[in-house]
């Protein structure tokens, strides 16, 4: 009997094993039936089945499975299987979600029946699994059923395998599963309940199935999108036609197949090149593709219909997708070929054979289906009650929420819904009221579509049925019971169809956008806003707006700083309208619906267009209290938020509702009081304006004095005018009696409404040079002074009143003329005319003063010139001046601008002016401001003088309106068809369907790429000005071929030949070309450009101002809907800095740009040879993409705060090309070592004989910068004066302004700091040169070696421009790429003593140092040996360390303040003496270290990225191994007792500048700054024992650049001051270190969810970083945050174990070496970060700064240690770590993919919704316009209201589309960064000794590009965070407003 039992047990075990390993549905059921029969189990006994089965099958394999299932069943929610023991459930559908729901209900103890209409699991399609899904399935024993389940990094499984796993688990838990049974419908309980209580049943096929009598209480629909359960309405999410193709190929599991990489997904939105290549090679056009390797090779792709038609897959094109994809319309053979071709290309033809797998029908497993529409149920559950029987109806899986397949959300969200449904059943079974059950379920369902792997709880072990364990911040009561009453369906409700009840008891939510809006309400609102404005009387929505004044008044009422309303002329309709259109477009993102010309040409504007346009203002500003007239002045006082403009503009498309907080308008005041009070306020403030302007714009004291004199004249004039006004009888009467005196009674503020600083902006029209501008005027185009700049740019033209800047009110006085006017005017008006005569006389005096000053300036300039310059100047004055000037004009005006004389700066057309719309009038004003300080610039002195001469001898020009019109930008030319004609198809385009870009209007469908015909988006396109064509970003690079480049160059050369005698002088004198189009190289985007200056698409920035600064470049931000192109021109007063739009402008200007690119970027002698490479660079990626609202923040920054004459075009071009040119840093190190010393010598010495190319340079300008690229080799082209940079050195500055005040003023002037800190190498030569100025925001100017790059434009365009770098610090893409060599002359020359003493004597006297610094130019003579020593980057001396300590002490003393630039001229004597003493004290120890490099010249040059490499390598090693390695060679370093230990706080992750400045710092700078900090911080790892060769940088330099480039040795004692903001260091570490990948998700930008949700704010993340105890916490999540006090001694704790003594005492390496290593190892182990361990291990014993250099063999010994490190890497790096890193990288890639797919899908849905609303809008518009037969039969008011709602809906969709595009851009950057990181890691895994020059260059290039991407991402994240903060603030304001009205605010 015992034998029989044993045999039976063995047999049962075998059958159970067969059941577990069964691979088909039928086989599983068969094995299960055999098992139950064998063990005498009753499957229908669901309560006891599992326990009986477990007791009878007890093999070791089975026990492991029972353990898994028991652990799951032990959750308290199940109550040991008794929670729902009385509930019967029917589940329709045996898919993964249905089975998972059945398992949960079985655990609850319910009776569960599953019906499945099939008996096979044949779907090989692969599902992506979220981490929690994998964990959940493992908890169910998935690994026991399927051994390959998620092995390694696999995170997907085929549907078939998943179904089998869940199928078997459900059977074991007692779930009753019926196959081949189809559910038909639910049968209600019969009415006759007396005899027998019969509840809810179902009808099945076959009809006689036993289940037909099964009564159930709960029915759950899990039958996919068929959704056979009634009562659930579905919402359709319709995108573009999406045809999905799935293909399964046989997997033979061969070695070749195993090597093929899977494709987690390729999203079109950030990998377009892949799809373009696929289309070009195969003709297959896809939107995405995924490849998973499972039991088959599974491919799924989304194909475009046209591609399928072209390839013959679809035979005929039908609109109906069902007909389109029906079997009769599909060629199966072509479909197979299509799928195979796509799979081959996607896998790079690596799969040896692609034979199709066979599906359950015996056919090749290829399917094509429609994913155009996705559906989601409006509700997740409902309750039915009949005959006292309740039925709970629920949906799960695709029935509930249909997934978009590329996102991989189907299974994950399906499982979550299954848990939520089981929780609902449990609640209902326990007696919870039905409405509460439904309300809770709906609350959870609202969360479901938003779930992502990132925003659900990460502790998967705690997951239970309870939703609180899965959803963070859960609110189960967000839906109230009364809101789901319609879901409880009883007999009494039968008469109400379900559709009706869908709207019953809907909550009365208050939403700003949902409130009732009618056109008459819009009219009333407009009347309120324009009340009190002269000549503005709004009575309707058509004619009242024709003059443009009403539009300007609306803008002025909310943002008075944007428009100078006083200066507007009522009769100038075109200008007024265009001004309003341009300002609204630039500031608010409101695109124009017409043009100024069209408004002027029609008597009555189109009503619908005006309603649509005005509705956007209404939507933007409604609910905003009116601004009181008299309070406007105070809004722009010292505390004004000048930064609002930029952030407002950057985010205007994201959210057009950003009202400024204003106090209510006080209407009680009389008009007279208003006028007089405002006038008096203007007078009282006039005296304050110059000082404030000087402060806000960084103007010099000298200019403040000059402006004070000027303003005295203005002040007197205004006082007279004010006195006159006060004596008049009544302003209102004056308005009636004297209507033509337009300036008298306007309720517009003169100076009061203007931001301070514009007092220096006279509204002058004549071309005579006048007042010098503020010294740093062009630097004001930053956020801080953005408003000021805007006001400056928007002073409209007034040709009749040339010299009256502040007398806007009396402008019309001067326009009055003729006796007839006098006769008809009342006495007061005649008095006004008399007063105007006084004003004229005052003006004449003013003009004479200005002319005299300009002449004196010209004389001074002339006498400072050399012979050639004087000759050129004289020649230009006597007969030859016209030639070059005309040439300049012709070059700079690609469009048909009349070549006005050079002395008169042609006013740009306001319709297209890159500056604010009134730029045409701004030009003269700017011109006046730009003359005086031109003398301070050296770049183009000759041309300046020529212009000055011509200006002084030309009659004043009166710019008539026709002239202005001809000079206006042709943004909206009428010749293009006007607003009602599509630019492409030339057909009618109605208002609702009208899109606009580049001044053209078109249909959405017509907006296509000229090459590939892909539909473009208004937020992302490229435009060719010449051809008038639009391109996608991929094809824009090809729009100008190399032949056209050659053609341009040929034309340029021919033009130069024709000009005969002028080539040399012209090359030397020429300004920067106005428009640089270098088709690809010039493509950049102005991150740093101010939002207040958009570039207009058609306007040529080419007009050369006579007084313009030589290298001024206009950087303007494109309007929200457009791309940017590079326009490099002598901008207007430098206020528009580097307009960047992706355009190819005229051939002339492009050619000029190419020819001048060398001089633009720097004196590159190979500019001509390098130019052809520019357009041939690889296709653009992210930098080209322009997005609607955050264009400035998404892409490469543009330098705005360069020095007075620095070319602001340089950084933009440089970064633009850098991303395209992988070879941009070729030869950078070789060039540096070969050129930097000679270049520095030249920089420090005056030119002995200036070459012809530098003829225009001032004698004080060293020739090194004009021809420094290749010594002795110069070309005219490459050394034009534009390359000279004015650094305001004493030798070159005419205003006696020292650099320090300049920078201090500049610090005050700029509202935000520079975007990217500049890298400055630690080379001893460079470190000892004081050439790196750091502005208070930490901005550094470029180092000299970067200028010396000799590979032409390509080198000059290098983004980071770190032609030299040091092991210790790595280049971060810089903002100001080039070090002006005047600063070399000032700073580097000043440090000649430092250089020479470091290289030779090692000492210098303080007097000598001071003297040499004052000399400015002194030649440095070095021997070859000394040069070699200086250029050896490993050469460090004791002197450096002492100097660095000194610098650190200095830095520590001023820790809380902004870091002031320390110029040589301002370095205090005390500091010099202290430095001298330090050097003397260490002089004796310097020699051995200095000799070390020469003793080890044999090894190959080290990789510039070796520090990062070794840091990451160490992070791969276990901490113990790293500890052993380091401790094997203890370092002998001592800290002399007598030396201070200022280094303990030397390095800190902090912003530069005060808290105020810090708050304004751009996020981009932080990323790059912290990037530099990180790699310096990581540096100890790289040279484990080379510290004896390493010395910190020069103390003076250190004091400036410390926060940007911390020294290696400072790492061990890094501290985090409480005030510091640890911004983006953790982010960067996560991006660059391998360690982080295994420890948690990325922070920063990566957590932007596709739905616009953020899991955790970036600010909170930074706060956490601050609170971490030490640097190790940067690599770990802060689970235990220390008290605030722990923030300061961040690293000191970490270092204390290294040395038992205090930091100030002597550390004895002999006693602390090994112990310290062990202690640090222990500490690092606690931190859990091997990277931190390695960092501290290296720097631990070396924490004391000073080394013991007595051992001459230390260098070689340390080299041995490094060699050992490299050799042991391959041996010690565990495979598991590599696997883990690979897995984490793949997971991150998958996250990005799914986000991208979601964004892509949502974009398509938005596009469809837009199309639908446009169709409806056009229909309504036709009716309203009377174009249909039934037009007169409908109520116009009702139609207009309906149409208006459609307009608002379209506006919202456009904003949403913009936000999606921004998210796509962020993902693109993230993906690009990840790929760069992986590539960099692969490069660094190569042994150092095996690397050649190319490897080093590639590493450098990759790193530079990665830093740029990091910076862009960080900037974007910060911008989005700011936007969210604003939105929250606005929402709070709105809620307060609603609550104040006594309303209840409920959210639905």
From Swiss-Prot:
Task: Give the modified residues of type Phosphoserine.
Answer: 631, 1677
EC number(s) in its UniProt entry?
Answer: 1.14.13.225
Q: What class of enzyme is it?
A: oxidoreductase
* Annotated PROSITE patterns: BMERB, CH, LIM_DOMAIN_1, LIM_DOMAIN_2
User: What Pfam families does the annotation carry?
Assistant: bMERB_dom (PF12130), CH (PF00307), FAD_binding_3 (PF01494), LIM (PF00412), Rossman_Mical (PF25413)
Its assembly, as annotated, is: Interacts with PLXNA4. Interacts with RAB1B. Interacts with MAPK1/ERK2. Interacts with RAB35, RAB8A, RAB10, RAB13 and RAB15 (in their GTP-bound forms); binding to RAB35 is of low affinity compared to other Rab proteins; at least in case of RAB8A may bind 2 molecules of RAB8A simultaneously through a high and a low affinity binding site, respectively. May interact with MAPK1/ERK2.
- Protein task: Methionine monooxygenase that promotes depolymerization of F-actin by mediating oxidation of residues 'Met-44' and 'Met-47' on actin to form methionine-sulfoxide, resulting in actin filament disassembly and preventing repolymerization. Regulates the disassembly of branched actin networks also by oxidizing ARP3B-containing ARP2/3 complexes leading to ARP3B dissociation from the network.
Q: What is this protein called?
A: [F-actin]-monooxygenase MICAL2
| Provenance organism | Rattus norvegicus
**Name of encoding gene:** Mical2
């Amino acid at each position: 009997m015992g034998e029989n039992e044993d045999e039976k047990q063995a047999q049962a075990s075998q059958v159970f094993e067969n059941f577990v390993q069964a691979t088909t549905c039928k086989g599983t059921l068969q094995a299960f039936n055999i098992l139950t029969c064998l063990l005498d189990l009753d499957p229908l006994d669901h309560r006891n089945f599992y326990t009986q089965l477990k007791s009878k099958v007890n093999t070791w394999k089975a026990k492991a499975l029972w353990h898994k299932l028991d652990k799951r069943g032990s959750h308290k929610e199940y109550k040991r299987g008794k929670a729902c023991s009385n509930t019967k459930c029917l589940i329709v559908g045996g898919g993964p979600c249905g089975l998972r729901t059945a398992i949960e209900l079985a655990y609850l103890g319910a009776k569960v029946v599953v019906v499945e209409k099939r008996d096979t699991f044949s779907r090989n399609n692969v599902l992506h699994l979220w981490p929690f899904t994998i964990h959940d399935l493992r908890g169910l024993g998935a690994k026991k059923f399927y051994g390959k389940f998620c092995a390694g990094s696999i995170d997907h499984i085929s549907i078939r395998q998943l179904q089998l796993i869940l199928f078997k688990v459900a059977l074991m838990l007692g779930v009753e599963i019926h196959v081949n049974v189809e559910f038909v419908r639910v049968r209600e309980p019969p009415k006759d309940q007396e005899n027998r209580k019969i509840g809810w049943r179902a009808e099945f096929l076959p009809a006689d199935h036993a289940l037909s009598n099964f009564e159930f209480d709960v029915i759950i629909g899990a039958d996919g999108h068929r959704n056979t359960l009634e009562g659930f309405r579905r919402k359709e999410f319709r995108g573009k036609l999406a045809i999905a193709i799935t293909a399964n190929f046989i997997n033979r599991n061969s070695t070749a197949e195993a090597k093929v990489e899977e494709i987690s997904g390729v999203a079109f939105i950030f990998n377009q090149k892949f799809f373009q290549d696929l289309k070009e090679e195969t003709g297959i056009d896809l939107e995405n593709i995924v490849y998973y390797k499972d039991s088959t090779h599974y491919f799924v792709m989304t194909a475009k219909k046209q591609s399928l038609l072209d390839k013959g897959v679809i035979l005929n094109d039908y609109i109906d997708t069902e007909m389109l994809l029906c079997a009769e319309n599909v060629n199966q053979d072509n479909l197979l070929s299509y799928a195979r071709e796509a799979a081959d290309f996607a896998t790079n033809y690596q799969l040896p054979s692609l034979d199709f797998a066979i599906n359950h029908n015996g056919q090749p497993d290829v399917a094509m289906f429609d994913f155009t529409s996705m559906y989601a149920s409006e509700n997740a559950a409902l309750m039915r009650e009949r005959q006292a029987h309740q039925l709970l109806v629920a949906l799960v899986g695709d029935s509930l929420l249909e997934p978009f397949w590329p996102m991989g959300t189907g299974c994950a969200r399906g499982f979550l819904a299954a848990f939520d449904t089981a929780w609902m059943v449990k609640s209902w079974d326990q007696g919870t009221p039905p409405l509460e059950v439904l309300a809770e379920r709906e609350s959870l369902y609202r969360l479901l579509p938003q779930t992502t792997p990132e925003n659900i709880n990460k502790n998967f072990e705690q997951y239970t049925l309870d939703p609180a364990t899965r959803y963070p911040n859960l609110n189960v009561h967000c839906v109230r019971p009364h809101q789901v009453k319609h879901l409880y369906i009883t007999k009494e409700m039968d008469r109400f169809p379900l559709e009706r009840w869908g709207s019953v008891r809907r909550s009365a939510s208050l939403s700003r956008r949902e409130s009732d809006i009618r056109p008459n309400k819009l009219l009333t609102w407009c009347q309120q806003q324009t009340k009190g404005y002269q000549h503005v009387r709004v009575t309707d929505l058509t004619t009242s707006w024709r003059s443009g004044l009403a539009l300007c008044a609306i803008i002025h009422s909310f943002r008075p700083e944007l428009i100078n309303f006083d200066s507007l002329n009522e009769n100038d309709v075109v200008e007024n309208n265009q001004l309003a259109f341009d300002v609204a477009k630039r500031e608010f993102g409101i695109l124009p619906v017409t043009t100024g010309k069209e408004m002027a040409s029609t008597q009555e504007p189109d009503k619908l267009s005006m309603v649509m346009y005005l509705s956007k203002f209404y939507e933007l500003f409604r609910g905003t209290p009116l601004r009181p007239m008299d309070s406007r002045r105070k809004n722009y006082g010292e505390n004004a938020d000048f930064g609002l403009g930029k952030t407002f503009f950057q985010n205007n498309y994201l959210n057009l509702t950003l009202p400024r907080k204003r106090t209510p308008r006080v209407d009680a005041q009389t008009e007279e009081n208003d006028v007089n009070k405002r006038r008096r306020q203007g007078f009282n403030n006039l005296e304050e304006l110059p000082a404030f302007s000087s402060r806000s714009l960084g103007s010099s004291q000298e200019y403040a004095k000059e402006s004070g004199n000027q303003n005295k004249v203005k002040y007197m004039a205004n006082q007279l005018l004010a006195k006159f006004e006060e004596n008049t009888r009544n302003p209102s009467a004056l308005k009636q009696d004297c209507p033509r005196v337009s300036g008298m009674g306007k309720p517009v503020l003169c100076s009061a409404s203007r931001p301070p600083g514009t007092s220096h902006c006279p509204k002058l029209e004549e071309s005579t040079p006048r007042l010098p501008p503020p010294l740093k005027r062009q630097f004001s185009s930053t956020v801080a002074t953005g408003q000021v700049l805007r006001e400056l740019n928007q002073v409209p033209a007034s040709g009749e009143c040339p010299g009256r800047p502040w007398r806007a009110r009396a402008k019309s006085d001067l326009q009055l003329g003729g006796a007839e006017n006098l006769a008809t005017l009342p006495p007061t008006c005649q008095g006004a005319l008399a007063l105007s005569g006084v004003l004229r006389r005052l003006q004449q005096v003013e003009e004479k003063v200005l002319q005299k000053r300009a002449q004196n300036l010209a004389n001074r300039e002339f006498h400072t010139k050399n012979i050639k310059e004087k000759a050129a100047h004289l020649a230009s004055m006597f007969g030859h001046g016209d030639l070059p000037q005309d040439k300049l004009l012709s070059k700079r005006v690609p469009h048909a601008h009349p070549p006005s004389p050079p002395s008169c700066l042609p006013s740009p057309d306001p319709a297209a002016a890159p500056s604010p719309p009134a730029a045409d009038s701004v030009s003269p004003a700017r011109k006046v401001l730009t003359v005086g300080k031109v003398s301070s610039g050296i770049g183009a002195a000759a041309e300046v003088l020529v212009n000055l001469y011509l200006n002084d001898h030309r009659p004043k020009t009166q710019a008539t309106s026709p002239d202005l019109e001809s000079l206006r930008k042709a943004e909206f030319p009428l010749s293009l068809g006007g607003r009602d004609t599509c630019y492409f198809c030339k057909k009618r385009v109605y208002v609702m369907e009208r899109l606009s870009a580049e001044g053209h209007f078109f249909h959405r469908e017509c907006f296509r790429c000229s090459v590939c015909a892909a539909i473009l988006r208004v937020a992302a396109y490229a435009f060719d000005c010449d051809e008038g064509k639009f391109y996608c970003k991929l094809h824009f690079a090809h729009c100008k071929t190399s032949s056209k480049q050659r053609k341009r160059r040929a034309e340029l050369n021919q033009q130069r030949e024709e000009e005969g005698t002028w080539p040399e002088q012209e090359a030397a004198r020429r300004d920067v070309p106005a428009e640089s189009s270098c088709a690809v190289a010039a493509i950049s985007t102005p991150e740093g450009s101010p939002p207040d200056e958009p570039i207009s698409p058609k306007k040529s920035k080419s007009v050369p101002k006579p007084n313009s600064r030589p290298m001024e470049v206009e950087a303007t931000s494109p309007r929200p809907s457009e791309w940017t192109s590079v326009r490099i021109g002598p901008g207007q007063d430098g206020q528009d800095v580097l307009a960047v739009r992706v355009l190819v402008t005229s051939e002339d200007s492009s050619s000029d740009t190419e020819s001048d690119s060398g001089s633009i970027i720097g004196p590159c002698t190979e500019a001509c040879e390098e130019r052809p490479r520019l357009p041939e660079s690889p296709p653009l990626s992210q930098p080209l993409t322009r997005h609607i609202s955050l264009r400035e923040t998404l892409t490469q920054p543009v330098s705005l705060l360069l020095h007075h004459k620095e070319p602001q075009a340089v950084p933009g071009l440089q970064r633009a090309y850098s991303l395209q040119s992988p070879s941009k840093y070729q030869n950078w190190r070789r060039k540096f070592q070969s050129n930097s010393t000679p270049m520095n010598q030249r920089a420090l010495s005056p030119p002995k004989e200036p070459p012809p190319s530098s003829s225009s340079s001032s004698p004080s300008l060293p020739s090194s910068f004009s021809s420094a690229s290749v010594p002795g080799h110069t070309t005219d082209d490459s050394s034009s004066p534009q390359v000279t940079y004015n650094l305001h050195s004493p030798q070159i500055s005419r205003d006696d302004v020292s650099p320090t005040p300049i920078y201090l003023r500049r610090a005050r002037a700029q509202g935000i700091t520079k975007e990217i800190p500049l890298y400055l190498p630690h080379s001893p030569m460079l470190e000892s040169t004081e050439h790196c100025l750091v502005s208070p925001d930490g901005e550094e100017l470029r180092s000299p070696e970067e200028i010396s790059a000799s590979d032409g434009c390509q080198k000059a365009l290098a983004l980071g421009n770190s032609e030299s770098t040091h092991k210790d610090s790595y280049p971060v893409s810089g903002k100001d790429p080039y070090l002006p060599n005047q600063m070399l002359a000032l700073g580097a020359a000043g440090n000649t003593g430092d250089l020479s003493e470091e290289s030779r004597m090692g000492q210098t006297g303080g007097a000598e140092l001071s003297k040499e610094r004052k000399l400015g130019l002194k030649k440095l003579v070095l021997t070859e040996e000394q040069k070699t020593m200086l250029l050896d980057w490993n050469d460090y001396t004791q002197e450096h360390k002492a100097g660095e300590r000194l610098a650190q002490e200095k830095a520590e003393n001023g820790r809380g303040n902004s870091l002031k630039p320390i110029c040589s001229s301002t370095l205090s004597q005390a500091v010099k003496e202290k430095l001298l003493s330090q050097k003397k004290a260490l002089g004796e120890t310097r020699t051995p270290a200095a000799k070390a490099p020469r003793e080890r010249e044999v090894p190959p040059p080290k990789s510039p990225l070796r520090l990062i490499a070794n840091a990451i390598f160490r992070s791969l090693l276990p901490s113990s191994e790293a500890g052993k390695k380091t401790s094997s060679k203890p370092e002998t370093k001592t800290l002399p007792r007598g030396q201070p230990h200022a280094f303990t706080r030397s390095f800190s992750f902090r912003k530069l500048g005060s808290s105020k400045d810090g708050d304004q710092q751009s996020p981009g700078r932080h990323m790059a700054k912290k990037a530099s900090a990180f790699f310096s911080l990581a540096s100890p790892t790289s040279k484990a024992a080379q510290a004896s060769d390493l010395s910190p940088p020069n103390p003076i330099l250190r004091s400036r650049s410390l926060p940007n480039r911390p020294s290696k040795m400072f790492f061990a004692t890094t501290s985090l001051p409480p005030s510091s903001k640890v911004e983006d260091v953790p982010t960067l570490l996560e991006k660059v270190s391998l360690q982080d990948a295994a420890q948690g998700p990325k922070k920063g930008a990566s957590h932007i969810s596709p739905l616009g949700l953020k899991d955790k704010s970036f600010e909170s993340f930074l706060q956490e970083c601050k609170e971490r105890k030490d640097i190790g916490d940067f690599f770990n999540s802060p689970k235990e945050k220390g008290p605030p006090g722990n923030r300061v001694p961040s690293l000191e704790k970490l270092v204390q174990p290294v040395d038992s003594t205090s930091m100030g005492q002597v550390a004895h390496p002999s006693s602390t070496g090994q112990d310290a290593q062990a202690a640090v190892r222990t500490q690092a182990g606690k931190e859990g970060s091997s990277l931190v361990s390695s960092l501290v291990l290296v720097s631990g014993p070396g924490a004391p700064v000073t080394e013991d250099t007595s051992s001459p063999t230390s260098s070689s010994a340390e080299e041995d240690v490094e060699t050992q490190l490299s050799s042991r890497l391959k041996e010690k790096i565990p495979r598991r770590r590599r696997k883990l890193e690979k897995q984490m990288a793949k997971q991150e890639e998958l996250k990005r993919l799914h986000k991208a797919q979601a964004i892509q899908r949502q974009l398509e849905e938005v596009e469809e919704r837009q199309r639908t609303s446009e169709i409806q809008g056009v229909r309504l518009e036709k009716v309203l316009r009377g174009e249909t037969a039934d037009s007169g039969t409908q109520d116009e008011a009702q139609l207009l209201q309906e149409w208006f709602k459609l307009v608002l809906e379209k506006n919202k969709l456009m904003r949403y589309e913009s936000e999606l595009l921004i998210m796509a851009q962020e993902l693109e950057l993230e993906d690009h960064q990840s790929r760069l990181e992986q590539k960099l890691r692969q490069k660094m895994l190569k042994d150092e000794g095996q690397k050649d020059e190319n490897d080093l260059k590639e590493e450098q290039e990759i790193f530079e590009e990665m830093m740029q991407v990091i910076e862009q991402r960080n900037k974007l994240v910060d911008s989005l965070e700011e936007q969210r903060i604003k939105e929250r603030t606005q929402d709070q304001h709105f809620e307060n407003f609603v609550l104040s009205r006594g309303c209840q605010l409920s959210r639905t």
